Amino acid sequence: GLFDIIKNIFSGL
């Protein structure tokens, strides 16, 4: 969902 995309961004930091 949308939160998965947000977690993906944090994973890339």
UniProtKB/Swiss-Prot annotation:
<keyword id="KW-0929">Antimicrobial</keyword>
<dbReference type="Pfam" id="PF08256">
    <property type="entry name" value="Antimicrobial20"/>
</dbReference>
<dbReference type="GO" id="GO:0050830">
    <property type="term" value="P:defense response to Gram-positive bacterium"/>
</dbReference>
<comment type="function">
    <text>Weak wide spectrum antimicrobial activity against Gram-positive bacteria.</text>
</comment>
<keyword id="KW-0044">Antibiotic</keyword>
<dbReference type="InterPro" id="IPR013157">
    <property type="entry name" value="Aurein_antimicrobial_peptide"/>
</dbReference>
<protein>
    <recommendedName>
        <fullName>Dahlein-1.2</fullName>
    </recommendedName>
</protein>
<keyword id="KW-0878">Amphibian defense peptide</keyword>
<keyword id="KW-0964">Secreted</keyword>
<dbReference type="GO" id="GO:0005576">
    <property type="term" value="C:extracellular region"/>
</dbReference>
